[in-house]
Each structure stands twice: as structure tokens, then as C-alpha cells.
Amino acid sequence: MTLINLFLALVLAVFELTTPVAAQRFDQVVRTDFFAGFAGDQARLQKGMAACETILAENPKHAEALVWHGAGLLFQAGLSLQAGDTQRGMELFQSGLGQMNAGITLQPDNVAVLIPRGAVLLTATRNMDPAVGRPLLEQAVADYEKVLGIQEAYFDTLGDHPRGELLFGLAEGSARLGRPEKARAYFERLIKDAPTSGQSKRADQWLKTGTLPKIVGTGCIGCHKP
């Protein structure tokens, strides 16, 4: 269940990284069902997927519904691959990735669209052959870098937890891409700007040793419940 737990952890963590104040966001409408589904409640996952499908039937260009539905498909792809159904898993993966990419194309500067794709790809690439996963990991880091650029104007108004999760994703992704200077800069900023995020110990270990503790179970240090 490691892949599922990692997927859940990152998605739960980064969906907090939105604008500091927002009206009823789309993710607030569907996320509890998706979070419960990612934790193993298939009925709740189907409820969340159905909500997205209803929105998309009315508006096929609803960017947030596309990325959420795409995230659900990628989660289902992971389940199929774990069950040994490679063909179905790859079909779901390609479909989910296509939906997430379509959402980004529609709203390339929307944090609530960028973050889901970045989060899912950061997690999914942990289990991929580097030759296949590297381009997707590069895209994930690019998504997070764009989010950071968008949020710089109000980054200090966000809590330590969302700041820490974004910076940790950037740092860890950069390290996995073989970009130690960038990784160091992000880890150092994490310790400075988000000292109580829960990721400071991991950042400090990397700065001292060049390695991170193995992520077992959930990767997010915060407290999230469906």
C-alpha cells in the first residue's frame, strides 16, 4: 500500500496551497470524498468522480474538475497496476494524465490546477523507471516552481504547513533530478520560512547528509482527516 499512501499524503498536503482567501472553491466541494476514496473508501471515491463528471458534462472545459477527475484516474491506475492489470493501469494513467494536462492548458496560472498535477506526478514518479519518470518529474517540479512564483506576493501569509509542503516538494524533486544546488536552496528556505511545518527535520538531514529518511506510509507530516 506504499504507493497509495504516498499518493494520498501528497495530495492531502498540497491541496492546502491555494490563495490565502477564497470563496467556495471547487476542491472544497469534492475533496472530502476524494480524500476518503484515496484512503480506501471506494464508494466515496466514486461519489467524488461522479461529481466531477456531472460538472464536466455541463462544462467540458472546467479546469479544476478535469485535474481532480484526472487525479482520481491516476489513483485508480495505481490500484490496477498493483493488482497486476498492466493494460488497464496504463490506459487509466494515460487518460488521467491527459485530463490533468488539459486542465493546465485551460488555466495555466491557476494554483488550484497546477498543484494537483504537480503533487500526483511527484508521487507517481517514485515508482517509475527513471527514463520514463524523469520528464514527468521535471513537469511536477516546474508546476511547483510556477506556484511558488505566483504565491511569492502573499507567501508569508500562508501557514508554515502549506509553505513547508511546497518547499519540500520543490527541494525533494530537485534532489531526485540531480540538482543539488537547487535542492539545498529550497531546503534552507524551508527551515527559514516554515520551521514548524514538520518538514524541518527532513530538510536538516538532507543538508547534513545529502539524503532523506525513507518515506514509509504517509509523506505529509500534517494532520489530515477525510
Residue ranges and their predicted role:
Residues 5-16:
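Bacterial N-terminal signal peptides
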Residues 26-28, 153, 157-164, 176-226:
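Terminal, low-structured helical/coil segments at or just beyond the last alpha-helical repeat
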Residues 145, 167-172:
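An amphipathic alpha-helical core segment
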Residues 27-50, 71-106, 119-153, 164:
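Short coil/linker segments at helix-helix boundaries
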Residues 8, 20-23:
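Boundary at the C-terminal end of the N-terminal hydrophobic targeting segment
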Residues 62, 69, 88-89, 110, ...:
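Residues that mark the junctions of alpha-helical repeat units in TPR/alpha-solenoid scaffolds
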Residues 68, 75, 116, 123, ...:
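"A position-specific structural signal for the A-helix of alpha-solenoid helical repeats
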Residues 53-66, 101-112, 148-161:
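Flexible helix-coil transition and linker loops at the boundaries of alpha-helical arrays
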